[in-house]
């Protein structure tokens, strides 16, 4: 069975984030980034955020993803935007990063921690703390459970064909605090499959492309299932964006 994020990527969606561009912009506006800033993006996918970072700040980004199959598309995106000199693209495992301690000023990781087990989440966040410089910042963006609901989590996992483990607000805060971070959070309505969110994230033409592809006969079942689930549970699931600062 095809994973939901891979399905949406195949439909033409470029922003595979629960809170879309709104949440990403809040994260980026919460930290000072200059051309000297060293950034690690974990789970970069096709590099949409990496491209935005370089174009906006002219900084260097190391972009990694565990899925080696997506990296050629990442490199194509980087080349198409003529920013190869700013970006290093590598395969990498969030729970076992290959970089020395205190290597980066910023780590950004969107829409990935939700898909990890509790143990894997803890391992990844500890790795982020390790590779961040003192005073560095971790920027994350995930799915928020507004209340504990095991059946809802199971239904979400079935809908997107991925075993996921979103947390409550208290759960997310505890995860980052346990690794020594001081987290600040923002949450709101998910935009991933919301019509207005699709337009905000992809533009009118991009949103139409996603919908048109999703309604092709071979795609209709999964597209409709995901669209219905996320809109039916708009009051049960939010996005959560977290700015977590490592003490100096």
Name each model-derived stretch.
Residues 40, 46-96:
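Class I SAM-dependent methyltransferase SAM/SAH-binding core
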Residues 4-19:
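Class I SAM-dependent methyltransferase Rossmann-like catalytic core
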Residues 11, 143-163:
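Short, glycine-/aromatic-enriched active-site segment of Class I SAM-dependent methyltransferases
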